[in-house]
Structure formats: structure tokens, C-alpha cells
């Protein structure tokens, strides 16, 4: 899947090669539920995912927030994006957005990440 200035974007299945199985097991695959090729994680887990992405020097191009209401996933239309070329700053923006969202809205949300495998 190409996009975002020609960088290769990571889809839900690509995360299988990047993340430990335990994090994948706790993720919520959104493909069947709402038709997007993303994985959502609760706050504590998405922070761990961000740390792994940072270690691998991958870019966080943005992300979306979904509300969990029992088994129902609700689109919140809340999101952020990053258009720079510094993977550290992309990580910082994602981390700041997610932390602020969690502090202001609580634990009934999951976060998806739009990630590129290149910092070029």
C-alpha cells in the first residue's frame, strides 16, 4: 500500500512481523468490525507499540481513535497526523496526542497507528 509521499505504509497484517505475539493478541483487528486495515490498542498497549516503532526508527504518520462500548467499536473522528521527516518527532507527536486523549477521555478508547517503514 503506497501513500504519504511514496513511503510504504504498514497495514494490520504487517504488524505481525514487527510486534511480539502478546501485543498482537491484545490488539483489536478492525478489518471485520468496521472495514479498516488497522489494529487498535488500549492505552497501555499502544504506548508499548509506539516504543517498538521508535526502536525500529519507523515513522508514525498519524492515527485514529475509536471508542469501545462493550463489543461495539464507534468511530470518534478524532485523529492526528504528522508530515515531517524526523521519526523521533513523529513518535513524540503520537505519544503526546495519545497521552492527552487518554487523560481527558479515559480508558474506553483504542488507538490505531499509521506507520511507515522508512524514515527517508
Question: Predicted segment positions?
Answer:
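Acidic, proline/glycine-rich low-complexity IDRs
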Residues: 98-120
Amino acid at each position: 500500500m503506497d501513500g504519504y509521499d511514496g513511503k510504504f505504509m504498514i497495514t494490520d497484517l504487517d504488524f505481525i512481523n514487527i510486534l511480539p505475539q502478546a501485543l498482537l493478541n491484545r490488539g483489536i483487528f478492525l478489518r471485520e468490525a468496521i472495514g479498516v486495515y488497522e489494529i487498535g490498542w488500549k492505552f497501555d498497549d499502544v504506548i508499548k507499540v509506539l516504543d517498538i516503532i521508535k526502536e525500529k526508527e519507523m515513522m508514525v504518520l498519524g492515527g485514529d481513535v475509536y471508542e469501545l462500548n462493550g463489543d461495539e467499536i464507534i468511530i470518534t473522528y478524532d485523529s492526528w497526523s504528522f508530515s515531517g521527516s524526523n521519526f523521533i518527532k513523529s513518535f513524540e507527536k503520537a505519544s503526546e496526542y495519545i497521552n492527552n486523549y487518554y487523560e481527558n477521555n479515559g480508558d474506553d478508547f483504542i488507538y490505531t497507528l499509521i506507520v511507515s517503514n522508512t524514515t527517508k
